[in-house]
Amino acid sequence: MPIDLDVALGAQLPPVEFSWTSTDVQLYQLGLGAGSDPMNPRELSYLADDTPQVLPTFGNVAATFHLTTPPTVQFPGIDIELSKVLHASERVEVPAPLPPSGSARAVTRFTDIWDKGKAAVICSETTATTPDGLLLWTQKRSIYARGEGGFGGKRGPSGSDVAPERAPDLQVAMPILPQQALLYRLCGDRNPLHSDPEFAAAAGFPRPILHGLCTYGMTCKAIVDALLDSDATAVAGYGARFAGVAYPGETLTVNVWKDGRRLVASVVAPTRDNAVVLSGVELVPA
């Protein structure tokens, strides 16, 4: 069904109420590779029983963490087949460290919808607040919908992420476990693209790929561990664009540049001619 811009743009979804526990946080951070050295206190700080420190990227998944069915893309004025949708970008901003357990209310609205001709880019913003109205985090997301352009909307900006023209200040090896996608799917993303070899083959991939949000969260953790002394509370904002795929079992490289107070990065796959997996990575310290 074509996108109905008059209905979709500015539409606000019904509020979603949800809660999470320290066990959810532990599982999420295990899914990102926390605990790779079970004797390292810094790794164990992500997995403490009642008070794990919480990476801000947990805010990107908290509202859907307990879903056990594949997601749908059906919203006011928007009805798109999941197989046509690619995750384009993600960002989270936190005014204060996230608690290891709690309850929240999330409200999502569609902020921009761009007509790229053969595709559409749909941008949304979600605010999560405590039951008494305190802002916990703001999440911004864009998706790329193949075959959904041509509805008469504005083309919008062209995203371009150019890494600094100098050698990175730091390079971090980021190994992906062979079973990492199977573990991360327990964090609320049951898209079979990440677990079913036949589904992945039908989508054009040689094997299931890693969730983009897993690579996204792993990269945040890698930068926090390398440059912020493994202190998840030192992050005020973090975001990235999804430029390519990652496969379980490979090792990625995180290239990090210091840019004033910001840390900017890209993620590449060295065994695939440095194919770019994430671009425009930005971490803003608190």
Swiss-Prot record:
Catalytic reactions on record: (22E)-3-oxochola-4,22-dien-24-oyl-CoA + H2O = (22S)-hydroxy-3-oxo-chol-4-ene-24-oyl-CoA
Entry keyword Disulfide bond: no
Gene Ontology biological process terms from the UniProt entry: cholesterol catabolic process; fatty acid beta-oxidation
UniProt-listed Enzyme Commission number(s): 4.2.1.-
InterPro entries, per database record: HotDog_dom_sf (IPR029069), MaoC-like_dom (IPR002539), MFE-2_N (IPR054357)
Pfam family name, one: MaoC_dehydratas
A molecular function GO annotation: enoyl-CoA hydratase activity
Magnesium as UniProt keyword: no
GO cellular component: plasma membrane
Summary of subunit composition and partner proteins: Homodimer.
Name of protein: Enoyl-CoA hydratase ChsH3
Organism: Mycobacterium tuberculosis (strain ATCC 25618 / H37Rv)
